[in-house]
């Protein structure tokens, strides 16, 4: 039975103020940095900012980024749509594994994906536009497969059958009937893929060349190399406006899609014809190969030298003489990343959990929960630059405290925590709270009786998800990190900037560890989510 919001009279006083802590956190670490960034644009250096906006260089980079993002989106759709059709509609042995594999690229840190493709393709494909597009399409396969597949799975195929009966070819039925019914999902997934590709940083830095740049990489160059903060602010402003426009256009296009009544159906058996059956199974097998090939190449690179198999790269992880004397040992980077992930998980779980709880309480809490989703539309470079301008210089310089990175990571993870926790609270039968209150329980005890069990599970799951986000985040950490305490993604990038196979091997070993840590946290989220789904409902136990 669906959840119902507790009545206002049954809500304990403290629960009515759960929105205050998330509002304060978002105000200080999201609104304030963005405001500082805006003030920088409009301040005395505004002339420099206006000059940057009017310069041809910023629009040349924008054109390159748009072209790259459009091409990446087209390739992701080209590969992702057949996979969405197969894993969401047909029943076959290994389907669950295929569906899980499709998700793997999306949860991998972008730095790991870039290194995996360098290990897989070597010098066969030169660094530049093509390699960046392939990597972006790989990362975003799950976006297309999940979003489009969820809608495709609900179509029975009756309309297509009617079209075939009337003489339409299989391709014609797909173009005239199936595609229009999937338009909203395709547009939504395309908008997300475009934004991710347009604002990419790690993949562009590792796989791109001087002709392959994004506004994100341009902001990094302006702040760390040119020390041109007004120019970086102008670039961040352009990126923020373009991303907002794309998401808005995607939402508008989705709403304008023709509505069609659909009949939810279960998985269908494989096609009876030999050729269609082989096509479905071949698509699933090809998808598995596409996903596993880069990861396998990364694993091989961690145990392979130019002429033999070796474990030297793994043995070098704890040594400061593995080409990283100036930067510290790779194992120290692992400790740093784990510490940041733990702090991120704690802060994001508390802030996001309180914001999600505020959703079920009538009042202004729902506005705060809506505000908590805003960081999804702010790029890492914009967030990192704003945070650096707000808290990275006197009179409030927090760089030496080591708190800027976990706070920025928590800000990025809060929307995901809300997305995990809020549905769980909504699905809880709120009448149990009223029953407990009627039996004499204190309002706080009544709330914990009704929502405590599910809240405990979803908070743990969302904390693990926030930790996974922190482990792989590269953009904000690049702006806010200290040279003496790099995270694992930053350490990987620095290793790859050094010549020699030892640096590449150690980077590959470090990337494998990062993959394992990330997947463990994702599996924790999945296990907790499965456990919550198996819990009996209140109505069922009554």
Place the predicted regions along the sequence by residue.
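Alpha-helical transmembrane segments of integral membrane proteins
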Residues: 249-282, 536-541
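Short, Lys/Arg-rich, polar N-terminal cytosolic tail immediately upstream
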Residues: 1-13
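Membrane-interface capping segments at transmembrane-helix boundaries
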Residues: 157, 252-258, 428-430, 523-537
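Membrane-water interface segments at the C-terminal ends of transmembrane alpha-helices
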Residues: 11-45, 54-153, 181-208, 234-250, ...
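Glycine-rich helix-loop "coupling/hinge" segments at transmembrane-helix boundaries
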Residues: 201-227, 306-309, 474-504, 537-541
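Glycine/proline-centered hinge or cleavage motifs at structural transition points of membrane proteins
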Residues: 166-167, 180, 439-441, 453
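Juxtamembrane inter-helical linkers in multi-pass membrane proteins
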Residues: 169, 259-271, 307-321
């Amino acid at each position: 039975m669906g959840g119902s919001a507790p009545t206002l009279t049954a809500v304990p006083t403290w629960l009515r103020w759960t929105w205050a802590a998330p509002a304060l956190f978002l105000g200080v670490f999201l609104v304030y940095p963005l405001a500082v960034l805006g003030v920088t644009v409009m301040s005395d250096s505004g002339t420099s900012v206006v000059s940057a906006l009017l310069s041809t260089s910023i629009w040349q980079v924008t054109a390159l980024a748009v072209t790259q993002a459009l091409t990446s989106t087209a390739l992701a759709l080209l590969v992702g749509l057949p996979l969405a059709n197969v894993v969401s509609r047909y029943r076959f042995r290994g389907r669950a594994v295929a569906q899980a594999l499709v998700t793997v690229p999306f949860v991998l840190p972008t730095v790991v994906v870039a290194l995996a493709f360098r290990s897989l393709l070597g010098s066969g494909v030169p660094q530049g536009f093509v390699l960046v597009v392939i990597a972006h399409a790989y990362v975003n396969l799950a976006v297309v497969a999940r979003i489009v597949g969820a809608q495709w799975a609900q179509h029975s195929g009756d309309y297509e059958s009617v079209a075939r009966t009337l003489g339409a070819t299989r391709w014609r039925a797909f173009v005239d009937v199936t595609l229009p019914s999937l338009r909203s999902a395709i547009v939504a997934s395309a908008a997300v893929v475009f934004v991710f590709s347009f604002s990419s940083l790690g993949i562009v830095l590792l796989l791109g060349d001087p002709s392959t740049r994004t506004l994100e990489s341009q902001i990094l160059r302006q702040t760390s190399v040119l020390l041109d903060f007004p120019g970086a602010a102008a670039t961040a402003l352009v990126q923020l406006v373009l991303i907002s426009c794309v998401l808005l256009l995607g939402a508008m296009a989705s709403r304008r899609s023709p509505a069609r009544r659909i009949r939810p159906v279960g998985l269908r058996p494989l096609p009876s014809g030999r050729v269609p059956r082989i096509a479905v199974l071949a698509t699933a097998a090809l998808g598995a190969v596409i996903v596993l090939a880069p990861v396998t190449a990364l694993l091989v690179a961690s145990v392979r030298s130019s002429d033999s198999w070796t474990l030297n790269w793994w043995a070098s992880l704890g040594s400061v003489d593995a080409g990283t004397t100036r930067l510290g040992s790779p194992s120290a980077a692992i400790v740093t990343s784990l510490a940041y992930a733990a702090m991120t998980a704690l802060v994001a779980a508390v802030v996001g959990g309180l914001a999600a709880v505020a959703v079920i309480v009538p009042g202004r809490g729902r506005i705060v929960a809506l505000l908590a989703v805003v960081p999804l539309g702010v790029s890492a470079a914009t967030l990192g630059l704003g945070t650096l301008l707000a808290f990275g210089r006197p009179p409030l310089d927090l760089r030496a405290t080591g708190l800027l990175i976990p706070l920025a990571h928590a800000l990025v993870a809060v929307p995901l925590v809300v997305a995990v926790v809020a549905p769980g609270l909504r699905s809880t039968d709120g009448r149990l709270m009223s029953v407990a209150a009627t039996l004499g329980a204190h309002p706080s005890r009544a709330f914990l009786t009704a929502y405590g069990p599910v809240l405990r599970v979803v908070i743990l799951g969302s904390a693990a998800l926030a930790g996974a986000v922190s482990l792989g985040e590269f953009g904000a950490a690049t702006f806010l990190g200290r040279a003496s305490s790099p995270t694992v993604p930053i350490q990987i990038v620095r290793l790859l900037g050094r010549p020699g196979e030892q640096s590449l091997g150690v980077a590959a070993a470090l990337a494998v560890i990062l993959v394992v840590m990330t997947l463990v946290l994702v599996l924790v989220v999945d296990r907790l989510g499965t456990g919550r789904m198996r819990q009996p409902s209140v109505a069922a136990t009554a």
